[in-house]
C-alpha cells in the first residue's frame, strides 16, 4: 500500500484565469480543429466534441443532428447491423464522417463491428469502450482491432493515468478515452472506491499521449460549458459529453409522464436499467455501477449545442485564444473554493 500526497483536481476545483486579448468578438474564434491520427493516418477536421456512446445519448438521431455542428457522435453498440444499414442508406457522407462505431471487447462485438464497418467506407472511427481499460485483455483487443482495421481511427478507454494511456497508444489506439467515475450517472467511485479527479487525469494523460503523438478525449465530469472549456484547457484533444446531451428529442431515452409533465429516463451503461435492457439483468457476481434519473424533456439538442459552442468561444476570448487549438497554451488554472454565486439557484 502507498499514498500519493499530491492533490488531484476536478473541474469544480479550478477556474481559468483571464488574460489580455486582441480579439474583438466571440465570432472571431475558430472552434474547428484539424487532426491527422498517429496510426490510421486519417485526417479529420471538425469541432472536437463527441456525444457519448450511451444508448440514451449516442443515437442515430443525435448523430444526424450534431453533424450539422461538425460535432462527432459515438453511436452506442446496441444497434443491429440491419439498423446500421438503414441509417447509412438515409444519411449523407457528411453525417457518416461524424460517426464513431462503438464496440465492446467480446468476439461477438468484434464480428459485429467488422460487419458494420464493411457497410460503408465513410465509417472511419471505432470507439472501443470498457469501464476498466487496465486489463490485459483490453490491451490485446486494441492491438487486434488495429491489425484488423489499419486505416480506421481507433478511440479506446477508459483509463486515467499516464502509463496506461501510453500502453494503449503503443498498442494501436489513436485516441485514448480518459475518465473513471466522473459521469453524472456513474456510481463507480462510491461502489468501488476507485477513481481519479477528472482535470488531473486529463492533464496527466494529455502529457503522456502527446509525447507519443497520440491524443485523448476527456470523458465525463462536464456539467456546464465552462467545464468543457476547462477540459480543453487541461490538454484534452476531444471532450465527450453524456449528461449534458441527455434528455433531448434525439437522445433516445424512454419518455414517461407524471402529473402532466413529461420526463426522459437517462441511465449509466453499468446501471441496473442498462443491464436489464441489454443482458437480462445484473449478474449475481457483480454490482450495478450506475444510476437512473428522470430528466425534464429539453427539446431539440441544437439549442444545447449552440450554448456549449457559445461558451467555448467566450472562454477563448477571455484568454486571447483565436483558435480552440490555442486554448490549452493560453490556460492558467487558479484553485478556488467557489465557482458561482448561488443565491438564486433554487428559484
UniProtKB/Swiss-Prot annotation:
What Pfam families does the database record attribute to this sequence? Answer: IMPDH
One GO cellular component term noted in the UniProt record for this chain: cytosol
Q: Where is the signal peptide?
A: none
Q: Which sites bind NADP(+)?
A: 108-131, 216-239
Task: Give the first-level EC class, as a single word.
Answer: oxidoreductase
Residues at the catalytic site: 186 (thioimidate intermediate)
Keywords from UniProt, A to Z, are:
Metal-binding, NADP, Oxidoreductase, Potassium
Q: Where does K(+) bind?
A: 181, 183
HAMAP family on file: GMP_reduct_type1
Q: Which PANTHER family match?
A: GMP REDUCTASE
Family statement: Belongs to the IMPDH/GMPR family. GuaC type 1 subfamily.
The free-text function statement in the UniProt record for this protein reads: Catalyzes the irreversible NADPH-dependent deamination of GMP to IMP. It functions in the conversion of nucleobase, nucleoside and nucleotide derivatives of G to A nucleotides, and in maintaining the intracellular balance of A and G nucleotides.
User: What's the protein here called?
Assistant: GMP reductase
Q: What is the organism field in this record?
A: Escherichia coli O139:H28 (strain E24377A / ETEC)
Amino acid at each position: 500500500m502507498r499514498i500519493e500526497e499530491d492533490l488531484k483536481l476536478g473541474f469544480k476545483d479550478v477556474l481559468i484565469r483571464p488574460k489580455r486579448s486582441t480579439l474583438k468578438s466571440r465570432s472571431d474564434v475558430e472552434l474547428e480543429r484539424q487532426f491527422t491520427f498517429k496510426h490510421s493516418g486519417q485526417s479529420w477536421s471538425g469541432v472536437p466534441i463527441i456525444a457519448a456512446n450511451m444508448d440514451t445519448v449516442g443515437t442515430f438521431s443525435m448523430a444526424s443532428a450534431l453533424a450539422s455542428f461538425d460535432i462527432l457522435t459515438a453511436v452506442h453498440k446496441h444497434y443491429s447491423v440491419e439498423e446500421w444499414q438503414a441509417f447509412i442508406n438515409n444519411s449523407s457522407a457528411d453525417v457518416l464522417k461524424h460517426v464513431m462505431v462503438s464496440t465492446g471487447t467480446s468476439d461477438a462485438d468484434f464480428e459485429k463491428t467488422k460487419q458494420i464497418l464493411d457497410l460503408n467506407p465513410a465509417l472511419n472511427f471505432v470507439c472501443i469502450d470498457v469501464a476498466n481499460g487496465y486489463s490485459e485483455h483490453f490491451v490485446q483487443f486494441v492491438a487486434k482491432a488495429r491489425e484488423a482495421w489499419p486505416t480506421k481511427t481507433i478511440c479506446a478507454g477508459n483509463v486515467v493515468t499516464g502509463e496506461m494511456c501510453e500502453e494503449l497508444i503503443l498498442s494501436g489506439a489513436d485516441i485514448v478515452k480518459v475518465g473513471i467515475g466522473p459521469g453524472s450517472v456513474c456510481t463507480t467511485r462510491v461502489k468501488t472506491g476507485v477513481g481519479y479527479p477528472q482535470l488531473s487525469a486529463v492533464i496527466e494523460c494529455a502529457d503522456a499521449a502527446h509525447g507519443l503523438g497520440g491524443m485523448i478525449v476527456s470523458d465525463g465530469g462536464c456539467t456546464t460549458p465552462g467545464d468543457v472549456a476547462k477540459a480543453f484547457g487541461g490538454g484534452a484533444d476531444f471532450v465527450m459529453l453524456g449528461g449534458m446531451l441527455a434528455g433531448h428529442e434525439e437522445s433516445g431515452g424512454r419518455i414517461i409522464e407524471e402529473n402532466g409533465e413529461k420526463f426522459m429516463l437517462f441511465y449509466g451503461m453499468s446501471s441496473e436499467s442498462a443491464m436489464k435492457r441489454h443482458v437480462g439483468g445484473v449478474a449475481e457476481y457483480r454490482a450495478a455501477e450506475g444510476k437512473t434519473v428522470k430528466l425534464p424533456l429539453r427539446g431539440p439538442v441544437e439549442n444545447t449545442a449552440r450554448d456549449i459552442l457559445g461558451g467555448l468561444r467566450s472562454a477563448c476570448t477571455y484568454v486571447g485564444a483565436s483558435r480552440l487549438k490555442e486554448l490549452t497554451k493560453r490556460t492558467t488554472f487558479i484553485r478556488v473554493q467557489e465557482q458561482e454565486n448561488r443565491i438564486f439557484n433554487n428559484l
